[in-house]
Amino acid sequence: MAAQNKVRVVVNGYGVIGKHVANAITLQDDMTLTGVVDVVADWRAQAAVQTGMRLFAATPSAADGMRKAGLQVHGTLEDGLRDVDVMIDCTPKRIAAVNVETYRQRKVKYIVQGGEKHSATGHSFVAESNYASAIGRNATRVVSCDTTSIVRTLTALKRAGLLLKARGTLSRRATDPWESHLNGIMNTLVPEDEIPSHQGPDAQTVDGELDVVTMAVKGPETLGHLHYWSVQMMRDASKAEVLDAFRSSARIALIPTRRS
């Protein structure tokens, strides 16, 4: 595709999520990554520059720090907004809620991540569930990993005409691996003190027809999250039919327990 016809994208926040998003954009034939924005001048920003990405600073003071670290800076967030069609905001929770006002003022379409509230965009997104409803919108929110998993799993059953309602218990990791030296828990479990936990209602922002209730507990590990489900079916179904329903999803991998 000709460069002038590609969607120009800037990623704000080059952390773990932002890094993956930016790398994915570089692999698309209908998009071009015009830059990444961050506030720190650590190894992550250095890696972005080394891979040829244009680096912008979130603030003027952040730009000063980056230049002192020897990084080439192409301006601030305001400069990045001059050459963009879509801003993907991967900044930490609650920061994007402030940034969206700037995006709206500049009339730039934007995507935020699951740490923000549904009200930040008025639309929450999981591709397999509600792709069509996102077309033509100026903004959406890609929900968290937990919520995405819930929607993918239950949508597969719903699409097969099997799902009546679901009740789930989530075992969540204590902290992200790259922050395990800063916070987390040890030798204990911390249950969320409200039922439902926030993940179930969050899934309903994507699909309001889901009858889902979740409970969650945080454990002393950083490997990942684990979900257990009790599902009431619309009708009797064989094990093979349930597995086929999950296989119908392009984003669910079935792994035999003997290989796990």
Which stretches of residues belong to each language-model region?
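N-terminal Rossmann-like NAD(P) cofactor-binding subdomain of oxidoreductases
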Residues: 2-177
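Active-site-lining helix/loop region of Rossmann-like oxidoreductase modules
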Residues: 6-23, 155-258
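Compositionally biased, intrinsically disordered low-complexity regions enriched
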Residues: 86, 91, 104-105, 248-254, ...
